[in-house]
Amino acid sequence: VLPCDDATPQESGLPARALARAGCRTLLYSANSGSMRVDVQPGSFLAFTDHVNFSGFNPLSTEREDGGWPTPYLSMAELYEARLTTDFVAAVEAAGVSMHSGVAGYWTGPSFETPAEIRLAQLAGCSISSNSFLPEVMAGYHAGMRVVAFTFVSTMSAGLGPPIALDPVLGLTRKAHDDFRTILRASIPAVAADRGPASG
């Protein structure tokens, strides 16, 4: 459940924390997004190398060093671990699915972003806009998991294409079912085989 569906950021991160408690070492997360780049068209995939949080909240803001969790005052510099992301992209492309890389911009939604917000995000170096991913990946990383995140690009961001509507976004996403299956089948063994250190 996402913040745009009336969950708190902390509640949105609970599934990732549960996976960490169950012993998972790596979180492979997929999102849906709009593109800010002309070379990343709807129907494309993009792996995250970093993110910019435009939401005004931090999902770790109420976390404390209790319950077995580490300090919430942790560096985000290696949230999207470069080596693990490189392994992920290589495995996916070897399976025949093209994977771009770039910086993700995060908003809570549920409304789509304004053209002015997208222009600001482009100045910040963002490649895509999304209202899912941030609470989950930050909670997973805080809980000690390594993180790989990617997105399916289902539309162009506001001001860069036709007006955004939900039905076409969902329709294009459904058509990508086979590519999603290929990505998961190819990448899960690759990221599981990379036994680098988890954070925390």
Question: Language-model segments: which ranges?
Answer:
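Metabolite-binding pocket within alpha/beta catalytic cores that recognizes anionic/polar moieties
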Residues: 1-76
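Zn-dependent metallopeptidase/amidohydrolase metal-coordination segment
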Residues: 131-169
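Alpha-helix C-terminal capping segments
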Residues: 20-26, 39, 124, 138-146
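General beta-strand structural signal in soluble alpha/beta enzymes
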Residues: 27-31, 47, 99-105, 128-131, ...
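Polyanion-binding loop/helix "lid" in catalytic or ligand-binding cores
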Residues: 69-80, 86, 118, 172-185
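His/Asp/Glu-rich mid-to-C-terminal helical/loop segments that flank catalytic regions of hydrolases
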Residues: 157-200
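Active-site rim beta-loop-alpha module in soluble metabolic enzymes
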Residues: 77-122
